[in-house]
Design a protein with these regions (language model features):
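Non-heme di-metal
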Residues: 1-246
Length: 246
């Protein structure tokens, strides 16, 4: 039986490497670390979280359309995908509720369209779910369920800089608690289904790809925020109520 600890260790190292590369140059992260206290940044960021996360249950469920040859392994993986998809339903509403907790008058129907970087990220995850190795989406899942340790400094900076409370960032706080359980589950299913080196290579490539594209998404959020405060991104006018913390 394959010992998966070395593989999980390599995934963890890859996450750290990719995230460190993002942190060094990403304006979204660096502006917060430098003390940016303008809540309008959240007015741009949280809609992108919403626009990303609402696709998670769909892309997770789409994987099963490719598991057409029943086997013990494929049936276990199918059950995992469908169960996990169901558990992800509605998580984007946390981002919506966080905006509302800040006093923003927003609804599902009024959410702005995604930025091009968010669209690219989402399209990549759809490709992972519908083409190539059927297990590769687990690379994205592994990152998504273990990324909150990396996002913790961002959440802490947002709370401190913008003088917020935990109730204003439920997506980070509550979602992070939920994903502790999911992190254990994704390790278990990887150990059950990733039986070949090709499977593990596909999972690793997907993990690295999703982190890099998420970094691009964060950079685009910051660029869009800068346009917004100059009056050049009217799709975010609902967030005008937000401003530098008092």
């Amino acid at each position: 039986m394959t010992d998966f600890k070395p593989f999980f260790d390599s995934l963890d190292r890859a996450m750290a490497e990719e995230w460190d590369a993002i942190v060094k140059v990403n304006p979204f992260f660096n502006s917060l670390m430098d003390g940016l206290d303008d809540r309008r940044l959240l007015g741009v960021y949280l809609p992108e979280v919403y626009n990303t996360v609402k696709h998670s249950p769909i892309t997770q469920a789409l994987v099963v359309q490719r598991l057409v040859n029943p086997s013990t392994t494929s049936l276990r993986y199918m059950a995992y995908c469908l169960r996990h998809a169901l558990e992800e339903v509605g998580h984007e509403q946390m981002a919506l509720n966080d905006l509302r907790s800040l006093g923003v008058d927003i609804s599902n129907e009024r959410m702005p369209p995604p930025t091009i970087a968010t669209e690219a990220f989402t399209a990549y995850v759809y490709r992972l779910a519908t083409t190539g190795n059927p297990y590769q989406r687990l690379g994205y899942t592994y990152w998504a369920e273990n990324c909150y340790a990396y996002f913790a400094p961002i959440a802490m900076a947002i709370v401190q800089n913008m003088k917020l409370e935990a109730k204003n960032l439920t997506f980070f706080v509550q979602h992070g608690e939920i994903d502790k359980k999911h992190g254990e589950e994704v390790r278990k299913i990887i150990a059950e289904v990733a039986t070949t080196q090709a499977d593990r290579d596909a999972i690793m490539a997907a993990l690295r790809g999703t982190i890099r594209l998420q970094g691009a998404m964060l950079a685009e959020v910051h660029r869009t925020y800068e346009l917004f405060i100059k009056g050049q991104a009217p799709q975010y006018d609902f967030a005008k109520i937000l401003g530098p913390s008092l």
